[in-house]
Amino acid sequence: MEKYAITPGDFLKNAGIVGMKYILDCAKAQEGVDFGISEDGQEMWLNCEFIQNADWTSLYFQACVQNFGRFTVYQGVMEKIKCCIGKIQNEKWNPGKNEKDDLKFINDKLLSNSYQAGFENIKDQIEHPEVYITLKKEKLIDKMTAEELLERLSKLQVFLEQEKCKETFIMKSVVYNYINRFWDGKSFLLRSNAKKDMREQFEKDFSEPFRKCFMTDHTKAKDLCIDCGEPVTTKEKVSIAFMKEVGDDFTRKRSAFWN
């Protein structure tokens, strides 16, 4: 079995190793077969066959949703919707300050620029997009009858529970609240890609090059990776200028460094 070893390094690399472990857990990868950790805890290895066959894009998005989803705006919106529906169904709906604030929260968060961009990306891949379109045209307000609010909120709840909606809206929060702390200006964080499919951008910029690296013959490669010393081809050289400045001046450095 051919293995690829990953050793600790600076802050960003170590954070990446922790992230990789989260992804492997989500993939239910077999320890000792697909990956492993040395006895002294100073090395993680990956089975090269596993690397080439894994759907890294799906695993990455799945890990982000699973680990950060409960801390995002999406979760807050779902809780507000559930609370409002419960009050109406139990005949305790009395639109006061709390109720008005809940409706405003739902409107504001779901109609934010990032959520609207996310909707545009997936509107042809989901069911009942008209639910979101209706919200854009007519926001939820406390002056609506309880029956109308119940119908609107119930449809909105079902709409948001769709896996594609859940993943897209959670990722919009994760991207700007977590990922953006470490890198920017590349893939789905490149401004010109804001309205493009996030999965497609991640696959093109990260997953596909990662797999190709392990399928490429490096016997004639003249350059070496700055981190592990392994040979890399000219096409595999990756600028790390998109990384945030945490301990290094990334803006001025270009190398075949893999984050």
PLM-predicted stretches and their roles:
Residues M1-K196:
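Conserved small-residue
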Residues L160-N259:
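Basic, glycine-/proline-tolerant helical and adjacent loop/strand elements
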